[in-house]
Amino acid sequence: MKFSELWLREWVNPAIDSDALANQITMAGLEVDGVEPVAGSFHGVVVGEVVECAQHPNADKLRVTKVNVGGDRLLDIVCGAPNCRQGLRVAVATIGAVLPGDFKIKAAKLRGEPSEGMLCSFSELGISDDHNGIIELPADAPIGTDIREYLKLDDNTIEISVTPNRADCLGIIGVARDVAVLNQLPLVEPEIVPVGATIDDTLPITVEAPEACSRYLGRVVKGINVKAPTPLWMKEKLRRCGIRSIDAVVDVTNYVLLELGQPMHAFDKDRIEGGIVVRMAKEGETLVLLDGTEAKLNADTLVIADHNKALAMGGIFGGEHSGVNDETQNVLLECAFFSPLSITGRARRHGLHTDASHRYERGVDPALQHKAMERATCLLIDICGGEAGPVIDITNEATLPKRATITLRRSKLDRLIGHHIADEQVTDILRRLGCEVTEGKDEWQAVAPSWRFDMEIEEDLVEEVARVYGYNNIPDEPVQASLIMGTHREADLSLKRVKTLLNDKGYQEVITYSFVDPKVQQMIHPGVEALLLPSPISVEMSAMRLSLWTGLLATVVYNQNRQQNRVRIFESGLRFVPDTQAPLGIRQDLMLAGVICGNRYEEHWNLAKETVDFYDLKGDLESVLDLTGKLNEVEFRAEANPALHPGQSAAIYLKGERIGFVGVVHPELERKLDLNGRTLVFELEWNKLADRVVPQAREISRFPANRRDIAVVVAENVPAVDILSECKKVGVNQVVGVNLFDVYRGKGVAEGYKSLAISLILQDTSRTLEEEEIAATVAKCVEALKERFQASLRD
């Protein structure tokens, strides 16, 4: 927000210079982005009057004038401005004057005619970019007065960044309140005298959306002169705030917006059919806006309508049909309180960002509308004339924001600030902020002012007290902290350790958005309902992720589109699953996921080009699981997942509970996502693995190990892992290692069966095993496999 320093000082005028004022505003939490003079550096320019104006005898576009600047004679000045005329009060640079850019005014002859000065435009004085003509001053401007003094050009434009919680500072009144509080000065508000109704004209107003519009004020003003010029003082204040003068009616509403922070709008009353209806738009309803563009409205957009059509987007932009124009004689002034939620995001949807929507999205003082209406009515009648009707007030008290009542405890205040502020000082600060304060024992009860809807909880009051007291006044004290050795459970497995392992295996960590495209997510998790955001950054980021796969697969596509075909990435982060049993109805699980695709190895002259397969990723995953000490308790089971290939995927179970999936992306999903080639993914619920099994030290056998190989024929649907587990269970005391080293299908093995070649490592810690014992254990394993899986030894 930009504003004039002199305008601010009309409300509150602390005895500090501009730099100190800017620093004070910054320290109050309203960061000053810049302080710029409102005009260039110049001197020797005074108010003058064009007494005579005649055509230059030797030039069609020049005029010869005689100008009174209050001296003992009239000055001859040649001027080329098209608006130069007799009787006009102007800004005159006299001989010896120096204009911006070190331009010195000297006596000269222009096309044979003497010129003893220059009639100046706004651009020539560095005031604005307007160079269409010379400055036209009011007829009562005192001749001979220094123009800097008359236009109050010894002023600065201050630009501040207003945080979303301080919407009350989007008007001069809000900044002035803060400056007054910080300097313990009274706030000098302009006198706003209610304008009595001189006519009975009204319009019927109906509010059909009270949740979106809690208060709507309307007032008819008849017989205005819309072509009346806006006073120079108002134009200058608007200009110094970065707003261009348009016409008197619009300038008045903009002035009130800047002064009080209350958006207003003026309708051409004669173009309103029937009356005003505040309602939600009909789906697909259209409205031609003031800038000539057509907006197609959604059913959640608030509109101001008459009995036949929409006239304006409520709190955002007016419509062309009902806008004020050169023929307007009667207007309806609108001043309303729209709830922030009913405005937020609607302007952005149509590519708009207006001063009104900026304020309504952040919140407007719900007690301000009557004051703003009276201020606008008074200014409008003073400038344009006319007669005002009564104020029409439609208010729904039930939906108006209520002022918060907050209890501030002394213990909380001292603990958060780390410094004791006297009771009477705390009370004084809260009252100067506009709170209604009741003192209690070691506490204060404060009712927040209507304009401070960001005051809701105790911490808000602590922040306000510290801010006004001054952060610089809180003494620095070293933090007293004893050095206590932290405890560490050996069973805690750091996620950082797992990340290091994956890095060592060639993976790179990525971080993707928690917001994802709901359409893509639905492809990966069909039929699963996700949490949708009410105000998303974009449609493609409007759902909370159900897994990390959505972001990881998008990252793979992004890399493949840039000729990076060998990708190994992983991510850890939260997923958000709807769960009625969880707080707020959403369960947040910490997940670890990874993706690989492309060649198994980097390109090398001595390595074959082989594409990664299921077992590459499963091997990496087993390395991660091995860190947890739970690998022996993990099972990989064939289980359907709509995102994975049915024949090249597995569910991961730990002690009978599913903790994740691993597999090749389903070919259909691969096609829809534009993935280039086979892509493999895994995902684990990390919280179920973080508590690792601490390895127990065991005696290392000094006796020789014995290997025996067996080949068993089993049905095709028998998982090899079950065969290995059964061998371990049967030979628990002597079998120290079981490994699958070959799978065979073909000649000698019936169709629907497979041959598994297994090595058994047998060893004892106390003695050398005899051949009979070894043979007995192997036979025991074979018998167990035969009983459970109908396995037979292969010939």
UniProtKB/Swiss-Prot annotation:
SMART domains, sorted: B3_4, B5, FDX-ACB
Reactions catalysed: tRNA(Phe) + L-phenylalanine + ATP = L-phenylalanyl-tRNA(Phe) + AMP + diphosphate + H(+)
Classification via PROSITE patterns: B5, FDX_ACB, TRBD
GO molecular function: ATP binding; magnesium ion binding; phenylalanine-tRNA ligase activity; tRNA binding
GO-annotated cellular components: phenylalanine-tRNA ligase complex
Boundaries of every FDX-ACB domain copy: 701-794
Cofactor annotation remark: Binds 2 magnesium ions per tetramer.
Subcellular location: Cytoplasm
Domain tRNA-binding stretches: 39-148
InterPro entries: aa-tRNA-synth_II/BPL/LPL, B3/B4_tRNA-bd, DNA-bd_dom_put_sf, Fdx_antiC-bd, Fdx_antiC-bd_sf, NA-bd_OB-fold, Phe-tRNA-ligase_IIc_bsu, Phe-tRNA-ligase_IIc_bsu_bact
Domain B5, chain residue ranges per copy: 401-476
One annotated GO biological process: phenylalanyl-tRNA aminoacylation
UniProt enzyme class: ligase
UniProt-listed Gene3D superfamilies: 3.30.56.10, Bira Bifunctional Protein, Domain 2, Ferrodoxin-fold anticodon-binding domain, Nucleic acid-binding proteins, Phenylalanyl-trna Synthetase, Chain B, domain 3
Disulfide-bonded cysteines: none
Residues bound to Mg(2+): D454, D460, E463, E464
Matches recorded under Pfam families: B3_4, B5, FDX-ACB, tRNA_bind, tRNA_synthFbeta
EC assignment: 6.1.1.20
Keywords per UniProt: Aminoacyl-tRNA synthetase, ATP-binding, Cytoplasm, Ligase, Magnesium, Metal-binding, Nucleotide-binding, Protein biosynthesis, RNA-binding, tRNA-binding
Source species, domain of life: Bacteria
UniProt cofactor(s): Mg(2+)
Entry's family note: Belongs to the phenylalanyl-tRNA synthetase beta subunit family. Type 1 subfamily.
Subunit structure: Tetramer of two alpha and two beta subunits.
Protein's UniProt name: Phenylalanine--tRNA ligase beta subunit
Gene responsible for this protein: pheT
